[in-house]
Amino acid sequence: MNEIRDILIGVDFGREVSQICYYDRKRQEPAEVSMKVGANLFENSTCVCCWGKNQEWSIGLEAEYFAREREGFLVENLFELCEEDQGVQVGEQYMEAWELAAVYIQGLIRFLGSMEPVKNTKCLAITVQRLNGKMVKNLQKACESCLWTTPRAFTTMLTASDQIFAAGMWDGSILKAMKCRFENCLPA
């Protein structure tokens, strides 16, 4: 990632897969972030896994691996849990939908490689295919629990009916909409 301060982050939070990107000011365009070093793998399964005696968390491909190989507790229906505001039993603990979403969002943001992502983020935009009040509440609480409550960062949520997506271009990628939406965050 080329950015170190005032990072503009976009997250596509999807039913089955999600992805993250950031706005590269040098190239003046959004840049995708690979989920696997040395590969062009930009989508990550929208799931989390709690595993091991230390209750470690993983997301996406790693979550699927640890569920299979280390007998972790895999939560695959994260999108639906947030949409319906339902918690779920994960091992010995009961987790609310927003808590699981926070684990997932933090995990995605780690792929950016920023040492202090909250401090260095100017804007976090989250897109979803379908938005309801429960989803908004869960994603807002997830971001707040990740400490995205300072004036330096804010969350924007878009839906398939948002004017940016009016042409029906929602294809699992926020990239085309990022530049348009983030122009409001860029210095004049």
What residue ranges belong to the model's regions?
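N-terminal short leaders/motifs
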Residues: 1-6, 141-145
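Gly/Thr-rich phosphate-binding beta-strand-loop-beta motif of the actin/hexokinase/Hsp70
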Residues: 2-32, 166-188
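Flexible loop/turn segments at secondary-structure boundaries
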Residues: 17, 132-135, 164-165
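Phosphate-binding loop and its immediate beta->loop->alpha context
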Residues: 26-149
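Generic detector of low-complexity/intrinsically disordered segments
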Residues: 43, 80, 160, 166-167, ...
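Conserved phosphate-binding/catalytic loops in two-lobed NTP-binding clefts
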Residues: 144-165
